[in-house]
Amino acid sequence: MDSTLTSTGPQQDTSSLNRARRAALGSFAGAVVDWYDFLLYGITAALVFNREFFPQVSPAMGTLAAFATFGVGFLFRPLGGIIFGHFGDRLGRKRMLMLTVWMMGIATALIGIIPSFDTIGWWAPVLLVTLRAVQGFAVGGEWGGAALLSVESAPKNKKAFYSSGVQVGYGVGLLLSTGLVSLISSQTTDEQFLSWGWRIPFLFSIVLVLGALWMRNRMDESAEFEQQKQAPQPVKKRLPVIEALTRHPGAFLKIIALRLCELLTMYIVTAFALNYSTQNLGLPRELFLNIGLLVGGLSCLTIPCFAWLADRFGRRRVYITGALVGTLSAFPFFMALEAQSIFWIVFFAIMLANIAHDMVVCVQQPMFTGLFGASYRYSGAGVGYQVASVVGGGFTPFIAAALVTFSGGDWHSVAIYLMTGCLISAVTAMLMRDKQHA
C-alpha cells in the first residue's frame, strides 16, 4: 500500500509538469503566429499600404488611412473574445486555440495576394479591411485561451514564468516579422519592394501556422477546466461573458488601464516611429527595422527573466516598475529622434519596448485571468484584454500620426500621450490590492 502511494506521487508530479510544459510550448507557438501576423501588418502599413492601397490621397492622409485599417483589426478583437471565450468556457480551451491559429494564418496569407489599387481599384482597400477584420476576430480569441491554458496548467508558484511564453511569442513574432521585412528590403529596390517584396512575409505565415498547429495538437486540456466541467452545474446558466461582466465589472476597467503602458510603448516604437522617422525626419527605414530586430531578440530573454522575478518578488512590483520606466522614457525617446542621435534612439527604444513593455506584459496572464472565476475566465479575461486593445492600442499609430499631422509635425503631443498612458498604468497597479497581485 505504501509503495503504491509513494510511486504514484512522483508520477503525478511528472505528468502535471509535462502537461504544463506542453501547454506553455503550444501557447507560445500560437502566440508567435498571432504576433508575427499582427506586427507584420503594422510594419507594412507604415511602409507600403499608404502607397499601394491609398494612392489617390496625399501622403499624410494615405498614412492615416493605412493606420486606420490597422485599427480595424482591433475593433473586431472584442467580438472574437466574446465568441471564442463563450465556446472556450463551454467546450474547452484547446479546440478554440486550434481554430484561432488557422483563421489568423489564412487571413494573413490572403493579404499577401491582394492586388493593388492600380489593378482593382477600391476593391483593394475593401479586401484589405475585410481580411484585417478576420485577423482581429481570430486574435481576439487567442490571448484569453492561450493565457488561460498556460496559467491553469502551470505549477502554483511558477504561473508567471510558465505563462510568459504567451508574451515571449511577441518577441519572436517581432523578430521574425521585422527580420524578414528587413532582409527583403535590403535585397530589393524600392520599386521591387513596393511591387512584390512586401508580399513574401505575408505568405510565409503559412509555414508558421503549420508548426503552431503541430505543437498545439500535442497540448492537453487543463485539469482545472476538466474539474470545473465535472462539477454540478445550475440548470440555467447565463452567457459566460455576461457572468463575468455582472460579477466583476471593475475588472474590465482595471485591465484597460493596466494595458495602456504595454500598448502605447509597443505600437509607438514598432509602427508609428517607423513611419515618423522616415517620412518626417528622413531617416532610413532600416534603422527602425533593425531596432525591431533588436527589441524582438531581447524580448525573448527579458520577458521570461522578468516573469521569474515576478514569481519571486511580486507581480505588482514588477508591473509598477515597468510602467514608471515607460513614463520616464517617453520624452527622452522623442528628443533623441529629433536630434537624430542613433545611440540614444536605440537606448530609449529599448527602455520603452523592452524594459517597460516586457516588465508589464510578463505578468498579465496570471494577473488578468485571476480576476475571474474558472467557469467564465476565458470570456472575462479574453474580452477584457481585447476591449483594452481597442481602447488603448488599436488606433495608437493613427492617433499619434494625427497628432503630428495636425500640430504641424511637432512631436510633443505624442510624447505626452505616451507618458500619460504609462502613468495611468503605474497608478492603477499601485492602487490594486497586494493580496490579489502581490
Role assignments for model-derived ranges:
Residues G42-I43, P249-L298, G392-P397:
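Extracytoplasmic gate region of multi-pass secondary transporters
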Residues R90-V101, R312-A323:
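Cytoplasmic membrane-interface "Motif A"-like loop-to-helix N-cap segments
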Residues W102-I120, V325-Q340:
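C-terminal ends and interior cores of transmembrane alpha-helices
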Residues F161-S185, G384-T396:
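Glycine-rich segments within core transmembrane alpha-helices of 12-TM secondary carriers
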Residues S186-L203, A402-T420:
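A membrane-interface helix-boundary motif in multi-pass transporters
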Residues A212-M219, M367, M419-A438:
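Multi-pass alpha-helical transporter architecture, strongest
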Residues R317-V363:
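C-terminal transmembrane helical hairpin of 12-TM major facilitator-type secondary transporters
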Residues S375-T405:
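A late C-terminal transmembrane helix in Major Facilitator Superfamily
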